[in-house]
Amino acid sequence: MKPILKNQYFLLRHGKTIHQTEKKNIIYGYPDNNPPCVLLKEGIEEVRLAGEKLKEKNIDYVFASDILRVKQTVEIIAEIIGYDLEKVVYDKRLRDINWGILGGKNKEDAWAYYDNDKMKKFEMSVPKGESWNQCQERMVAVLNEIENSYQNKNILIVSHGDPLWLLEGYLKGKSNRELIDEMNNNQDIKTGEIREI
């Protein structure tokens, strides 16, 4: 069931990093990689294009993950849309999903932990990690706080792939099965992409 919203939301995934290229086939999330994962030149360009699209949206508030690749994204966006960086709210709950002991593993090996059944990831977490449901719960908690604090505002949320995919699913009232179908059909949010809700 879709929630009734008081605000307009713009979900933006950070720009492309080395981990979104064909060269990498590993699971990552947070804690941030060592050395930290930074935007590629292509990622910076994606974000600039997103910023140009956001210019006309009159963004009132920006909420973002505190991970470096998102901070870099926010800095570029803020400059383009004329938003004061001092006003950005960085929130740890908007971080990427925590893959725990699977972080840094090959994607195929990581999915083997779930018997190659993506539906299991909604309920099942790994040691030192979290499930998709847990990730969605923390994203929705931030959304609820925003909804309780503001009305008729244009809100930009800058985060990561899985968290934004899960938040968008909640906002659109999608079932877990619908979310998996979306992922399998490569319809989840791409780097530098804006989804308007």
Show which residues each predicted segment covers.
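Glycine-rich phosphate-binding loop signature in dinucleotide/nucleotide-binding domains
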Residues: 56-58, 146-153
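Beta-strand elements within well-structured catalytic alpha/beta cores of enzymes
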Residues: 8-12, 153-159
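Acidic, low-complexity terminal tails and accessory targeting/binding regions
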Residues: 1-7, 53, 97-109, 153, ...
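Phosphate-handling substructures
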Residues: 18-22, 26, 31-38, 79-140, ...
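Alpha-helical structural signal in soluble globular domains
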Residues: 76-80, 166, 170-174
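Short glycine-rich phosphate-binding loop at a beta-alpha junction
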Residues: 59-66, 89, 154-158
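GST superfamily/GST-like fold recognition
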Residues: 161-165
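Active-site-proximal alpha-helix that buttresses catalytic centers in soluble enzyme cores
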Residues: 2, 7-8, 12-83, 133
